[in-house]
Amino acid sequence: MRSRRYKKKGPVRSKKVTYDGITFQSGLEKYMYIALKKAKIKAKYEGQTYELVPSFNYDKSSYERQSNGKGEYKDRGKKKILNIKYTPDFVGSDFIIECKGRANETFPIRWKLFKMYLFHTKSEVTLYKPQNQKECDETVSLILGKRKT
């Protein structure tokens, strides 16, 4: 019996797609846009950016290499640390949708920080994170069902 060889999954390589004059980051986002439009659900594509962690000045020493692991091991502290921002794919009046085929390295922590941000700001939105077309269709059904009640 032949043993199966599995390909190592590389980095996320989604292809940008243009539709209705909007450039989407992936085909799944385009599919979600069409599904929302067909159901007459108003949502803005990448309509709002949230600051999850504000920038700050780090005035202490920090010995490290560059963030890509290259360069000299030296003091890279005493500088401004940039903020962490998050822009969801679709923002509606009572929902936020993030289409994710395959999450990249930073997404899980950013998603948790975003949930924490919504918790602390007492936001009353429902989050949806469809990962395929079937889940996009289910998301639309859930939004429509919630609005009927």
Predicted regions, residues:
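Electrostatic, structured charged patches in enzyme active sites and in nucleic-acid/phosphate-binding
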Residues: 1-149
